[in-house]
């Protein structure tokens, strides 16, 4: 949520920065209209309440003097009815104002490249060289089928499209990656390990920015107002909702394993095969709560933490600085990490690392005090994938494939695989 004071005091600057997102910003004009009406209602209500107080004193004096005050009492009855109506109008205007504020995206940071589509994203750097194969490259779903480690057909029968059964060494590889990532982030990068609920309430989804704008993308549970989480960012960030944190405890780092659930609305016909775009997938998430002046240094560290996973796995990747038109609703600055997928001769996203500044903190009311005498301030929140496990499996299968269809297990994972160094086709 944007700072209301900034909207009121520097609206043109807000319009300028939001215009770079290539989105409809007419809600800003609605904000001005509703905010002005709200101020008028407050002024009228306060004037009437002051009048009521004054007249009440007059009525008391007249009654003590045994004078007739019926005309003033009748007038005050009308005033009270008007105040009641104004209070209800103010409540409705506050609801409208909150809805408008919740619908406005974050302001892009000045260092975010200006652009309209993914074609305007800037390659910041690359790591590793894509392997030169001397045989025909197979996509990961073919390799997995030959090895009997992924079963999309049975998952389609049991549930539907965009689901998968991991079997045998495939299930072990998924679990090995989860343990490897969690160990790396908790033991070497200083994150506290968390396994959160996979179901959250509406307030939590609103706090991190998924609602109200993207409700159609979420899996809603019938009955109670619950949602399956699209990412562990939602429950982990909301751990500190409505809290005032101790500044001495910042920064706070959390790493969380969870299943993630995405409806993939608008993705019909895209990535219909394999692990790249699933309705359910596992992910290790990185979440930070930091002081405002430290958040961009912390973003750099966050990206490096996610990169380290790919470096240890020996998977080539590149890092993109996302442009204003491809930034996402909540981020002020975002880097995407894309891993090399040989069968597509392309890089595919495997992590997004974002600085939300105080955007989520305002929505979720997450604050901190620098010391006991200081006023509470909003924290800055950050999050990134560390990594999406299914896409990491796909990248390993394709980058480590051999001519006979076998898949070599990256050396760093072998202790987590019980010493298994290769998955052979059946």
From Swiss-Prot:
Compartments where found: Cytoplasm
GO molecular function terms attached to this record: ATP binding; catalytic activity, acting on a protein; serine-tRNA ligase activity; transferase activity
Transmembrane segments: none
Binding-site positions, L-serine: 231-233, 285, 385
Keywords: Aminoacyl-tRNA synthetase, ATP-binding, Cytoplasm, Ligase, Nucleotide-binding, Protein biosynthesis
Domain of life: Bacteria
Uppermost EC category: ligase
This enzyme's EC code(s): 6.1.1.11
Pathway given in the UniProt record: Aminoacyl-tRNA biosynthesis; selenocysteinyl-tRNA(Sec) biosynthesis; L-seryl-tRNA(Sec) from L-serine and tRNA(Sec): step 1/1
Catalytic activity: tRNA(Ser) + L-serine + ATP = L-seryl-tRNA(Ser) + AMP + diphosphate + H(+); tRNA(Sec) + L-serine + ATP = L-seryl-tRNA(Sec) + AMP + diphosphate + H(+)
GO biological process: selenocysteine biosynthetic process; seryl-tRNA aminoacylation
Gene3D superfamilies in the record: Bira Bifunctional Protein, Domain 2, Serine-tRNA synthetase, tRNA binding domain
Binding of ATP, residues: 262-264, 349-352
Pfam families per record: Seryl_tRNA_N, tRNA-synt_2b
Record-stated family: Belongs to the class-II aminoacyl-tRNA synthetase family. Type-1 seryl-tRNA synthetase subfamily.
Subunit comment: Homodimer. The tRNA molecule binds across the dimer.
Domain notes: Consists of two distinct domains, a catalytic core and a N-terminal extension that is involved in tRNA binding.
Function field: Catalyzes the attachment of serine to tRNA(Ser). Is also able to aminoacylate tRNA(Sec) with serine, to form the misacylated tRNA L-seryl-tRNA(Sec), which will be further converted into selenocysteinyl-tRNA(Sec).
Protein name per the record: Serine--tRNA ligase
Provenance organism: Brevibacillus brevis (strain 47 / JCM 6285 / NBRC 100599)
